[in-house]
């Protein structure tokens, strides 16, 4: 039935494949059995330009006539002449993609023609947002093989190219980053296996088959990419409503032993992915794509942003399919005659499950690809063993009784991963998410028994695609021709131009000849593409595919040296989120035995920019490497960069660093003899943080950009741990240094990860990383681990760690020449590595500082186990070559950069489906815990929504590892396992685990050492700061501020700390604001206010330096809402007599003759007076007494100045005093007041006033007294008579009431006796002159003699009338007496 999208695609879809599928004539003598139709995944029928027929096994009816997308043809479009593939070219695939059991590598080689010799030019242009794929290639001998068997191509090694990119499901069509991919190798052919298009996404799996004439290298890649969501450019929705794309990359490489210069064979198990039926209806669709590559051709790696660079749209609509990927393990062929050592890779990769429409539930499964690189130790004859995984199977059972690496049986409990709380059903009805069985890629290298050549090849196939986000991470093994081994240029990812060139001698042409990767750094959402470096044909490619849902693509870098070179193994795990910058780095350091030259290569990836520098320089792609022509290539830099963790694992050393900060481990060996690579043991889980660079090479730590590090430290995204160590690490590494991990912490949050760890029963695990609480059962195994950062270094940042900074372990073990005897069927030693610890999530607790990695208390035992042991290489004949190499002292330091594995649970999209991570411990050390968590690794998990942060736990290998002993179980399929154990004790203080200059002292404690810390530090590793301020070390007036490793005493304003005392200094401060309008022309021209501060400080120092006792000037600028506040402070010694006026004058002169920048001069000139009085008093108020003093700071010291009339005994007094009464202040001295004055300052004359008033009052009183006395003494005797006779009417007689005698009218003598009664009482009533006062007397009467002469007092007995006579009228009776007074 035709897919709903069949109408969209032009019928000639396969015309695109036509130029790539031209087959060369088979070499004479080469015979291949005809492929069985039942086993053919796809058949390439000859077509005459009209297109070719693509037959999909078991789903033929669903193939609509494919139509290619818009297509740009390159030059030399191939004509319609297309030749059918030779019978030998026919591809075979066993049932379920399994390779037939039994057989040998030789038999596998015979399936391929050996005449692929013609050169061809390939120009492939990819438009990521466009569905254009133009390929121009003249090619012959193209082989499309679907069988899981190893096939030997012609004598020319072939290059593997995996170009599988998927369009962004989230409609990220807006950014069409264009990637130009040009292949110009000579003598290579191109092969495109198949292209399958899911309904909403494009599945493009193309194999560029590049045969070369030097050696045969076969590599098959099955690429399945399923992508959910509809690509924005496609514009049509699926009929089924399901948008799903998934990509599984499986690669196989075999190398035929045609010449001694062959590259190590790389063999990756093939993946068969049967698609499950939608709605339980419709035939299943199995896709199997193989890429064959010549070993000599570089691997061209194309990383695209969310859109796929190559989109081969197959009309077949893929509904949601449950993909059970079964991985057949293929044993790499061994060189019969002195060929370079071959590396076998067994790829067990889990493809992501298909995704349901509407993204109701996206199941993301990251493939756990474990590339195990076994040093040439044991070669297993068994190639046919294969591991098959069925999503619905309860167990994951390897069909062959003898597992290829001695893994007798792999139990995969509960193969179908569980999403959320429920287990994902493996039935075909499941549309929301289909279970994916994950297999691991096991990379095994066989050392050639010739010339001591050591070749190790990393082959990591990590196809992790989430249904939600199409993150297809492809692992690209790279075959390097032995002939061009010595010339190579590091592939450089340039930040601006996403061009990576791999210089190779085999490419005689210039930059065009060098294989170039077009890495589009401008991919939307911060896509990162990383090209691994390759030295001497060491091809490291890190492909990071950004998916719309922030998935990160895990790319493994595989690189090998063959001819006389030390095998260099590097694996780069790139996981980046779309929004977060991931810095992934691949470091390969090669040193010639005769040269001390070394190169450190690093990729620092920042947001949308890829930068690769070689020795600090951008290396342009060139045919020759600038300095690396080396005969001895130190193998070791397996670098794994994870969003939060990068683990560098090597048998010699393991280095863990934060993924945010790319860690570079480079080791160069100067040993004259070819080093014996150590077997990769489960050291990947060891916390061997020691790197073994030679003494001449210093470890270069790549300091990741703060941008990159910051997002990661904050990103909760889980990080897969791809733990691969190069087995070919030379033993003759004279020095090991522990590079310090970057300063960023690894994982912000922890999350649980149920992981099933499979341990091979027959293998002795050198290091069992199985956590104590972890069980082999996948279901029961859910171990939450809290992130532990063992040590936080106080140092702020890490720039680089010189070799001498860490103690090195010297080991020398030349490769014995006996290795040259390896037979054609060497079985790779199945070194058992129980990588069970994967589940707990290895955490890279990365040192935040430049301090060397510290051993965490719980991790490795104090004694570093010797990671050495004779390696038994068994040939099929049973001859065993025992390579005993001197001990390599690798301190087992569980450093802060411990191995960290990402939490195995992946929360896909908004759904809470958790995918348990299962890791099968491969026989080699390599273990990639990278679960299809490509998306998960990236903080892209944000887009995933509920993905909890990975838990990070420092793996304590001390429990699992037998201290001081390392056992390698080397087992041949035909031989009984040989266990070689070597024990050596290593001083725990070799790497100086004590931080902050602490002294390490070895002892017999559990940790094996203790640290003598400096006074400022404490703790087991001297990582805890001591708060010195608790002991009050500062003066009483100073404030103590604790710092990391020290403290600061800060004196108040106006004081300066000198000799432990805050001394008073002359301080002039000011503060002014600059408005925004002014800032637009001056300050804002500077990117940072720090520049303004520095400029002003420089100007002030220049101005005031001429003044005496000048100390310094400080400037502080701060931004406010609409202005910038600038504070100035200038200090002088107290002995200086500088005043504020002096500073103002000097400042004015400086401004007038300003020699600073125009902005600063304008800034200072805008202020009329920079320093103003009172500024210091505002900041430092001495609390003066307002009544008696005021604050002044004119002389640079805030003092209380007394008001007039007041004085101070001390100038520092805050108040003033006045003199006492009777004193006044004269010349600052109190003087007594003059007479009569007193009070304050003698201003009160009260004494004088008192004297005057007292005298006046006394005199007055005296006068009054005298007057009174005088008055009293002066009396008049006549007063009575005067009163009586005052007037004539007044009578003093008591008889006044009686009337007068009328008869008496006159008062003469003759009339007085003539009264009425003859009484004389009336005499008293007379008012005549007789008794009148003297003053009243009439003078005339006196002259006439009328007045009598008697003037006696009245009341007397004497009569007034008759003076001198007795008065008869006087009555003495008291009763009648009347007092007249």
From Swiss-Prot:
Signal sequence, start to end: 1-29
PROSITE patterns tied to this protein: ASX_HYDROXYL, EGF_1, EGF_2, EGF_3, EGF_CA
Disulfide bonds: 989-1000, 994-1011, 1013-1022, 1029-1040, 1034-1049, 1051-1062
Extracellular side: 30-1248
Keywords: Calcium, Cell junction, Cell membrane, Developmental protein, Disulfide bond, EGF-like domain, Glycoprotein, Membrane, Phosphoprotein, Repeat, Secreted, Signal, Transmembrane, Transmembrane helix
Modified residues (Phosphoserine): 1359
Domain of life: Eukaryota
Residue ranges, Cytoplasmic side: 1270-1381
Extent of Low complexity compositional bias: 38-52, 93-105, 301-316, 508-522, 657-680, 706-748, 810-825
Compositionally biased spans, kind Polar residues: 424-444, 620-648, 774-784, 792-809
GO cellular component terms, A-Z: cell-cell junction; external side of plasma membrane; extracellular region
Reported function: Receptor component of the CCM signaling pathway which is a crucial regulator of heart and vessel formation and integrity. May act through the stabilization of endothelial cell junctions.
UniProt-recorded name of the protein: Protein HEG homolog 1
Gene this chain is encoded by: HEG1
């Amino acid at each position: 039935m035709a897919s709903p999208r069949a109408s969209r695609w032009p019928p000639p879809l396969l015309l695109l494949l036509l130029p790539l599928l031209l087959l060369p004539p088979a070499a004479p003598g080469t015979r291949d059995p005809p492929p069985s139709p039942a086993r053919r995944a796809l058949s390439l029928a000859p077509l005459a330009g009209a297109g070719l027929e693509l037959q999909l096994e078991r789903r033929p009816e669903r193939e609509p006539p494919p139509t290619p997308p818009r297509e740009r043809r390159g030059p030399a479009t191939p004509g319609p002449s297309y030749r059918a593939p030779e019978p030998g070219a026919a591809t075979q695939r066993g049932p379920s993609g399994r390779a037939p059991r039994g057989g040998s590598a030789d038999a596998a080689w015979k399936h391929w023609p050996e005449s692929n010799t013609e050169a061809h030019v390939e120009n492939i242009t990819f438009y990521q947002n466009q569905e254009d794929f133009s390929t121009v290639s003249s090619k012959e001998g193209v082989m499309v093989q679907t069988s899981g068997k190893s096939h030997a191509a012609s004598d020319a090694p072939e290059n593997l190219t995996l170009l599988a990119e998927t369009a962004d499901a989230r409609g990220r069509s807006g950014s069409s980053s264009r990637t130009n991919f040009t292949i110009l190798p000579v003598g290579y052919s191109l092969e495109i296996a198949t292209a399958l298009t899911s309904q909403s996404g494009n599945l493009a799996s193309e194999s560029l088959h590049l045969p070369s004439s030097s050696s045969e290298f076969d590599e098959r890649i099955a690429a399945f990419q399923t992508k959910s969501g509809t690509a924005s450019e496609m514009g049509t929705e699926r009929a089924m409503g399901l948008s799903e794309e998934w990509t599984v990359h499986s690669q196989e490489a075999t190398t035929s032993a045609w010449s001694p210069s062959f590259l190590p064979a790389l063999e990756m198990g093939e993946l068969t992915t049967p698609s499950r039926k939608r709605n339980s209806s419709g035939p299943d669709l199995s896709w199997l794509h193989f890429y064959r590559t010549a070993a000599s051709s570089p691997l061209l790696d194309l990383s695209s942003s969310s859109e796929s660079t190559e989109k081969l749209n197959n009309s077949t609509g893929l509904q949601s399919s449950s993909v059970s990927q079964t991985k057949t393990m293929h044993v790499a062929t061994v060189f019969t005659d002195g060929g370079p050592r071959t590396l076998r890779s067994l790829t067990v990769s889990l493809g992501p499950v298909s995704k349901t429409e509407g993204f109701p539930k996206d199941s993301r499964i990251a493939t756990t690809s474990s590339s195990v690189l076994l040093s040439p130790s044991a070669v297993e004859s068994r190639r046919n063993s294969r591991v098959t995984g069925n999503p619905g199977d309860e167990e994951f059972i390897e069909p062959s009784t003898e597992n290829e690496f001695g893994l007798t049986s792999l139990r995969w409990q509960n193969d179908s991963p569980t999403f959320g709380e429920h287990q994902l059903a493996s039935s075909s009805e499941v549309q929301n998410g289909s279970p994916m069985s994950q297999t691991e890629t096991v990379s095994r290298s066989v050392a050639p028994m010739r010339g001591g050549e050591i070749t190790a090849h990393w082959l990591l196939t990590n196809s992790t695609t989430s249904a939600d986000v199409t993150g297809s991470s492809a692992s690209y093994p790279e075959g390097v021709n032995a002939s061009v081994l010595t010339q190579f240029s590091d592939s450089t990812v340039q930040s601006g131009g996403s061009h990576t060139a791999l210089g190779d001698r085999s490419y005689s042409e210039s930059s065009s000849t060098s294989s170039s990767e077009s890495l589009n750094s401008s991919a939307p959402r911060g896509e990162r593409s990383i090209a691994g470096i390759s030295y001497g044909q060491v091809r490291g490619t890190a492909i990071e595919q950004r998916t719309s849902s922030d998935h990160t693509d895990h790319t493994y870098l595989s690189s090998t040296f063959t001819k006389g070179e030390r095998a260099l193994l590097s694996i780069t795990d790139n996981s980046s989120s779309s929004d977060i910058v991931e810095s992934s780095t691949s470091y390969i350091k090669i040193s010639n035995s005769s040269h001390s030259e070394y190169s450190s290569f690093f990729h620092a990836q920042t947001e949308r920019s890829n930068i690769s520098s070689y020795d600090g320089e951008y290396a342009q792609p060139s045919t020759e490497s600038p300095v690396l022509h080396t005969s001895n290539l130190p193998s070791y830099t397996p670098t794994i960069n994870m969003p939060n963790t990068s683990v560098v694992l090597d048998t010699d050393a393991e280095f863990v660093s934060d993924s945010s900060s790319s860690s570079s481990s480079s080791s160069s060996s100067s040993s004259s003899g070819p080093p014996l690579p150590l077997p990769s043991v489960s050291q990947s889980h060891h916390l061997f943080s020691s790197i073994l660079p030679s003494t001449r090479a210093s470890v270069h730590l790549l300091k990741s950009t703060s941008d990159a590090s910051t997002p990661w430290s904050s990103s909760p995204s889980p990080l897969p741990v791809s733990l691969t160590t190069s087995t070919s690490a030379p033993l003759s590494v004279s020095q090991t240094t522990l590079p310090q991990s970057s300063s960023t912490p690894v994982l912000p949050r922890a999350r649980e990860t149920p992981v099933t760890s499979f341990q091979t029963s027959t293998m002795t695990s050198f290091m069992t990383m199985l956590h104590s609480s972890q069980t082999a059962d996948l279901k029961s195994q859910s171990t939450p681990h809290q992130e532990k950062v063992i040590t936080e270094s106080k140092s702020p940042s890490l720039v680089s760690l010189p070799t001498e900074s860490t103690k090195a372990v010297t080991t020398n073990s030349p490769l014995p020449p006996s290795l040259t005897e390896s037979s054609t069927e060497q079985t790779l030693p199945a070194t058992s590595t129980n990588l069970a610890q994967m589940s707990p999530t290895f955490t890279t607790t990365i040192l935040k500082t430049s301090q060397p990695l510290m051993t965490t208390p719980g991790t490795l035992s104090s004694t570093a186990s010797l990671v050495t042991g004779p390696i038994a290489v068994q040939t099929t004949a049973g001859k065993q070559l025992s390579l005993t190499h001197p001990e390599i002292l690798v301190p087992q330091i569980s450093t802060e950069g411990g191995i960290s594995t990402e939490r195995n649970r992946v929360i896909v999209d908004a759904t809470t489906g958790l995918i348990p991570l299962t890791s099968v411990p491969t026989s080699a050390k390599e273990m990639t815990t990278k679960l299809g968590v490509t998306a998960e690794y990236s903080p892209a998990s944000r887009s995933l929504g509920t993905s909890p942060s990975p838990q990070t736990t420092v793996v304590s290998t001390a429990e699992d590892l037998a201290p001081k002993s390392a056992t390698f179980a080397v087992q041949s399929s035909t031989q009984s396992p040989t266990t070689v154990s070597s024990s050596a004790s290593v001083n725990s203080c070799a790497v100086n685990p004590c931080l902050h200059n602490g002294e390490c002292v070895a002892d017999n404690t559990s940790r094996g050492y203790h640290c003598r810390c400096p006074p400022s530090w404490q703790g087991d590793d001297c990582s805890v700061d001591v708060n010195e301020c608790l002991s009050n070390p500062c003066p009483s007036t100073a404030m103590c501020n604790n710092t990391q490793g020290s403290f600061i005493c800060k004196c108040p304003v106006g004081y300066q700390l000198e000799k432990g005392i805050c001394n008073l200094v002359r301080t002039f401060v000011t503060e002014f604001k600059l408005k925004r309008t002014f800032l637009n022309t001056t300050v804002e021209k500077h990117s940072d206010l720090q520049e303004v501060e520095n400029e002003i400080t420089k100007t002030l120092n220049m101005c005031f330096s001429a003044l005496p006792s000048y100390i310094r000037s400080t400037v502080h600028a701060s931004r406010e809402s609409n202005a910038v506040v600038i504070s100035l402070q200038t200090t002088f010694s107290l002995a200086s007599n500088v005043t504020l006026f002096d500073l103002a004058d000097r400042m004015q002169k400086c401004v007038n003759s300003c020699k600073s920048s125009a902005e600063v001069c304008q800034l200072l000139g805008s202020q009329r007076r920079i320093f103003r009085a009172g500024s210091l008093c505002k900041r430092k108020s001495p609390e003066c007494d307002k009544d008696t003093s005021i604050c002044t700071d004119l002389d640079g010291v805030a003092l209380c100045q007394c008001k007039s009339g007041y004085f101070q005994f001390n100038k520092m007094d805050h108040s003033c005093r006045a003199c006492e009464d009777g004193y006044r202040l004269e010349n600052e001295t109190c003087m007594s007041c003059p007479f009569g004055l007193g009070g304050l300052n003698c201003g009160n004359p009260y004494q004088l006033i008192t004297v005057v008033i007292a005298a006046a009052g006394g005199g007055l009183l005296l006068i009054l007294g005298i007057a009174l006395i005088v008055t009293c003494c002066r009396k008049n005797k006549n007063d009575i008579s005067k009163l009586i006779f005052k007037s004539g009417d007044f009578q003093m007689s008591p008889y006044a009431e009686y009337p007068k005698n009328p008869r008496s009218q006159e008062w003469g003598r003759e009339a007085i006796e003539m009264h009425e009664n003859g009484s004389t009482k009336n005499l008293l009533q007379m008012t005549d002159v007789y008794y009148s006062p003297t003053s009243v007397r009439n003078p005339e009467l006196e002259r006439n003699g009328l007045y009598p002469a008697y003037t006696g007092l009245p009341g007397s007995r004497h009569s007034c009338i008759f003076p001198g006579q007795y008065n008869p009228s006087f009555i003495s009776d008291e009763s009648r007496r009347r007092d007249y007074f």
